[in-house]
Every structure is written in structure tokens, then in C-alpha cells.
Amino acid sequence: MSEFLDIVNENGLPTGRIVERSVAQMEGIWHRTSHVWLVRRKKETVQVLLQKRTAFKSFPGCYDISSAGHIPAGEGFLPSALRELKEELGVSAKAEELICCGDRTIIWDDVFFGKEYHDRQYTRVFVLWKDMEEKDFFLQPEEVDGVRWIDLELCIHNVKENLFPHCIELPELLMVRDVASKSPLAVKQA
């Protein structure tokens, strides 16, 4: 079944036209995505949840954003983010629990499974504080091979130094750190 996306302008606003997802990624047409990073306090540190992508996705076997997805035509950033959390990780959340880190653009040109890929995303990035154990997530097997909590600062270091297989962009991870560090939940309560 085809998935249709809103074509957006440079400000992430729908133009009133739609495009098939595969065409958007083949031709480099701008569309929207939502990214949600789950974070939690563990002892003295803030941890971030990474998902491991399946072998059948682009960037197979790489660690990635906790939950992310393309926004279907007619849907907004928040509903899409909440839907993807539920589908990929089995996590239910309310819109008011998501903390917006900001918007960013992603331009990515590559070849996956022998096909050219020209991705142009206008992305809204969110943080969700969620203290769950890895075993308590209900993973979507077509999308996610597993999940792993990692100290946020260690994750930033490992991404900078490319010390593990990942498709995480450092500027986005720094956005997450900035927002998470300002939250009262980031500070250990006395």
C-alpha cells in the first residue's frame, strides 16, 4: 500500500500537494518527519533510548532515534509522533508530555539496496521522559530489532567518534541534550 506525504515548503508548511513516499525519497522532494527521543534519569546521569534498526530498513543494524517516522498527508507533527511511539515501541504518551526541542532540516543522499535515495526532511524533534526498562517495550518487529539505554554524554561522545554503528546526527543529539538538561527531571531530587 502506498504511503502519501504532504509536500512542504522551506518552513515545513504543507503546499497543498501530496507525493508518494517512495517518489519523495527518489526525487528529493521536501516532506515532514517527527523524531522522539526517550530520556530518563539513572543515578547521576541522563540516559537516552536508542533503537536498533532491522536488517530490512535503510541503515540496517544501526542504532537510531528512539522513535521516528514520516508524517502521512494531512497529519501533524504531534499526532504522528504519538502514533509512531505506540507503533514502534508500544509506548503510550499524551501530547503535553512531549517537549519540543525545535525543528531542523535533513538532507541525505545515498544508495540503499541498489536504489538512489535523496531524502529532504523538515523534522520536528521531541523529548519524552519515560522511565522504562528495555524489556518493557513492545517492539514493532518490521522496524526495530531492539532498544538500548545509554548515558546521553557517552552517546554524544560515541557518535562524535563514530564508535558504534549508528545513523544519528550529532546536531540533533545536541538539541536533545540542551532540552533534557534544562528539565527539572534532569536534576536529582534531594
Please provide the spans of the model-predicted regions.
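Short loop segments at secondary-structure junctions
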Residues: 11, 40-43, 54, 129-133, ...
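Conserved hydrophobic "DFG−1" position in protein kinase catalytic cores
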Residues: 7, 38, 50, 127-128, ...
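A short coil-to-beta-strand element that immediately follows conserved catalytic motifs
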Residues: 92-103
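Acidic, metal-coordinating catalytic segment for phosphate/diphosphate chemistry
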Residues: 1-44
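Conserved Nudix-box catalytic region and its N-terminal flanking loop in Nudix hydrolases
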Residues: 23-34, 44-83, 87
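Nudix hydrolase/Nudix homology domain
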Residues: 22, 61-63, 67, 73, ...
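Short, well-ordered strand-loop elements centered on a beta-strand within folded domains, enriched
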Residues: 14-18, 44-52, 135-139
